[in-house]
């Protein structure tokens, strides 16, 4: 497992590092670009996300057809081009254009689908935890390095670093990552609309949207409020992010262990939302930088509790032959949330105040918490594995209640089922009849 998961996790972590490294300081430095204002800064933060939203599904679907490696390469090359455009930008509109190009390279769903291709569902949580650890490490490094490097070398160095890492990832993809496994599925692909409107997938998609929306709002507002309104030194922003990501990194470990490892994914999702509510409540009433920073720490804990389990949860509700497309939809919702968060956050901050923005976030989070209560607990799903040489009458399972899907890989015959509707002994009896 590690031979494929480690390099892919590095690629995903590097991509997130490239995305996150500009976020802590982008709103501050971009205000100095020609033609910039708070609304356009919000649009700048959201520009990357809107293109990711549009292209996640096409890239996920393309990867189901031509393969994950080729699709990853296309996305990384596009991201590199966008990074160079941003690095050379001298006005807000060129910077927005570069972020739009960066966003076209929508490989998040492809990389996650590729990791799930290499792993059994029962140990997928470990693979996702490894990926989550790389994302968390990339996140933590970017939060600390971003203010330091931008203060010393300027904003453009961050985009050059992003481009360089992406070039290295392409080399790694072809030198280290093993050949992709093939999957033969018994089902026809479900209509695309079902990937959007199936109840549990829809709840996970909306969860992805809200989580990314509140993250965009936080990264837009935190540096502006701390520096412009509460008098915190811009040069010391890295300390805020270092403290917050340290707590967040510990929370990520707990999230992965208790969520997928112990079967408490749904509970962890709910706890994360509760912490979002608490953090924005602290933001709303803060009159000092110290109290505001407490809210930042709480926010990072909630955010990092979610990170190791969200995509793993989404894959459990998707069939194996459409994981790329399903994760594309999931990530598209997330990136729409990032875009909308940047735009609505910039608008409210420009037209009203941060207090109004925080109250808006609290109200939406309460709705989100209630929605998650209706999510089916992912731990009710299990898989049975049989060797390819074992003779089984799998066709009879097509109309059996409780059978989610069955398919063949190059190693096993796999049957996924709902433990609340059917058990292993009954499945084996039916297959041997």
Question: PLM ranges: what are they?
Answer:
Residues 54-90:
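Conserved MFS/SLC helix-loop-helix module at the cytosolic interface between two early adjacent transmembrane helices
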Residues 164-182, 368-376:
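C-terminal membrane-cytosol helix-exit motif in multi-pass small-molecule transporters
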Residues 49-57, 139-140, 245-253, 338-339:
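Residue-level signature of mid-helix packing/kink "hotspots" within the transmembrane helices
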Residues 56-67, 251-264, 349:
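Helix-to-loop junctions at the C-terminal end of transmembrane segments
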Residues 24-38, 220-236:
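Short amphipathic helix-loop junctions that connect adjacent transmembrane helices
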Residues 98-135:
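Cytoplasmic helix-loop-helix junction between adjacent transmembrane helices
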Residues 65-75, 260-273:
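Cytoplasmic membrane-interface "Motif A"-like loop-to-helix N-cap segments
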Residues 178-207:
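Juxtamembrane intracellular "pre-TM" segments in multi-pass secondary transporters
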